[in-house]
């Protein structure tokens, strides 16, 4: 789910999300995947429910492995998707939360073993990295409340907060928009794709 700049603002904005790397990156992996990218009309309950309905539509009408359905959200899209996976954690095996704040609940994620990868620049200009740490702490606490060990939590929850040097060495100096670089990292994408609803947490 893309951010504000690729939301739906009328016909002139149609398809602006299709060149977004957060969409294209998944199609360039060796594994066959169905990739769906929606354009938000807001980042509140309307788009949350639309995201869930879109997921359900593809599950019901296409050849989808229901144990391997994933979500990704960047910026405003992350605000929406964190709510969507919290509302329907039974649908998703893993979620990539990029450069965003967490607007959903934590407990439903832990109760349904949804794996979450959180990526935020240390000096993100819009949200600040404290938002990412807060989300990580909330999810970690929810998994501990469930009785999981640190090792088990490590299988399900990762926080990555790169410093300025990480971005500057890649000629990136706007750290919020630079958060899109997470979609260039096949290690992260493959971590998401490695998760399954049928996977036993060791």
Give the label of every model feature segment.
Residues 78-89, 95:
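Short glycine-enriched nucleophile-adjacent loop
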Residues 1-52:
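Active-site machinery of serine-nucleophile hydrolases
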Residues 127-145:
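Short alpha-helix in the alpha/beta-hydrolase fold that links the catalytic acid
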Residues 119, 125, 144-202:
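C-terminal catalytic histidine-bearing segment of alpha/beta-hydrolase fold enzymes
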Residues 43-75:
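Gly/Ser-rich "nucleophile elbow"/oxyanion-hole loop immediately N-terminal to the catalytic nucleophile
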Residues 40, 96-104, 123:
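Active-site nucleophile loop of the alpha/beta-hydrolase fold
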Residues 30-31, 110-116:
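Short, proline-enriched alpha-helix->beta-strand connector loops that line the catalytic pocket
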């Amino acid at each position: 789910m893309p951010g504000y700049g690729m939301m739906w603002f009328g016909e002139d904005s149609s398809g602006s999300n299709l060149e977004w790397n957060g969409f294209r990156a998944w199609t360039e992996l060796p594994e066959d995947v169905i990739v769906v990218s929606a354009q938000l009309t807001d980042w509140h309950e309307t788009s949350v429910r639309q995201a869930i309905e879109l997921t359900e539509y593809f599950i019901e009408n296409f050849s989808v492995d229901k144990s391997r359905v994933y979500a990704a959200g960047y910026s405003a899209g992350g605000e929406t998707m964190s709510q969507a996976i919290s509302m329907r954690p039974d649908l998703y095996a893993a979620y990539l939360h990029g450069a965003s704040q967490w607007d959903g609940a934590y407990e439903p994620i832990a109760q349904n073993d949804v794996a979450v990868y959180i990526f935020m620049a240390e000096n993100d200009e819009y949200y600040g990295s404290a938002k990412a740490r807060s989300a990580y702490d909330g999810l970690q606490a929810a998994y501990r409340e469930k009785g999981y060990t640190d090792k088990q939590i490590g299988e399900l929850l990762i926080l990555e907060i790169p410093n300025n040097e990480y971005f500057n060495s890649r000629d990136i100096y706007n750290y919020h928009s630079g958060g899109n670089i997470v979609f260039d990292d096949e290690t992260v994408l493959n971590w998401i794709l490695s998760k399954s609803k049928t996977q036993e947490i060791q």
